């Protein structure tokens, strides 16, 4: 399946189609959207965002705890879309504050 992902970035909103077997960060790069990242392995907070609408599968990640995931935090480098959704990006400072 392919889902519509909307990213709310500091420079505006961007929408793209993301297959359910491609990480959101990787697909964003494919379509020319620059997002922050560092480890690309779900073990840091550089790519952190917040899910506003929809759902993701980020079971490959290890940095976030269950409480943070429950609050909507997402690591875009290890997140697959499982529905159409909206994610606020560039949230590392807020997450680690």
Curated annotation (Swiss-Prot):
Q: Which GO terms describe its cellular component?
A: chloroplast stroma
Chief location bin: plastid
Ranges for domain 2Fe-2S ferredoxin-type come to 3-93
* This protein's UniProt keywords: 2Fe-2S, Chloroplast, Electron transport, Iron, Iron-sulfur, Metal-binding, Plastid, Transport
Q: Name one Pfam family in it.
A: Fer2
**Residues that bind [2Fe-2S] cluster:** 39, 44, 47, 77
Q: What GO biological process terms are annotated to this protein in UniProt? A: electron transport chain
> Sorted alphabetically, which SUPFAM superfamilies does this protein's record hold?
2Fe-2S ferredoxin-like
- InterPro entries, per the entry: 2Fe-2S_ferredoxin-like_sf (IPR036010), 2Fe-2S_ferredoxin-type (IPR001041), 2Fe2S_fd_BS (IPR006058), Beta-grasp_dom_sf (IPR012675), Fd_pln (IPR010241)
Write down the required cofactor(s): [2Fe-2S] cluster
- Give the Gene Ontology MF terms in alphabetical order: 2 iron, 2 sulfur cluster binding; electron transfer activity; metal ion binding
Superkingdom of origin organism: Eukaryota
Q: How is the cofactor bound?
A: Binds 1 [2Fe-2S] cluster.
Q: Where does the protein end up?
A: Plastid, Chloroplast
Summarize the protein's role. Ferredoxins are iron-sulfur proteins that transfer electrons in a wide variety of metabolic reactions.
Query: Of which family is this protein a member?
Result: Belongs to the 2Fe2S plant-type ferredoxin family.
- What protein name applies here? Ferredoxin
> Which species is this UniProt entry from?
Colocasia esculenta
What taxonomic lineage is listed for the species of origin?
Eukaryota, Viridiplantae, Streptophyta, Embryophyta, Tracheophyta
């Amino acid at each position: 399946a392919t889902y519509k992902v909307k990213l709310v970035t500091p420079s505006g909103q961007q929408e793209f189609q993301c297959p359910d077997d491609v990480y959101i960060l990787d697909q964003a790069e494919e379509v020319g959207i620059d997002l922050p990242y560092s480890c690309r392995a779900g073990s840091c907070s550089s790519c952190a965002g917040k899910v506003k609408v929809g759902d993701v599968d980020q079971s490959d990640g290890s940095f976030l705890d269950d409480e943070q995931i429950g609050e909507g935090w997402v690591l875009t480098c290890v997140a697959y879309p499982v529905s159409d959704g909206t994610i606020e990006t560039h949230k590392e400072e807020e997450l680690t504050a």
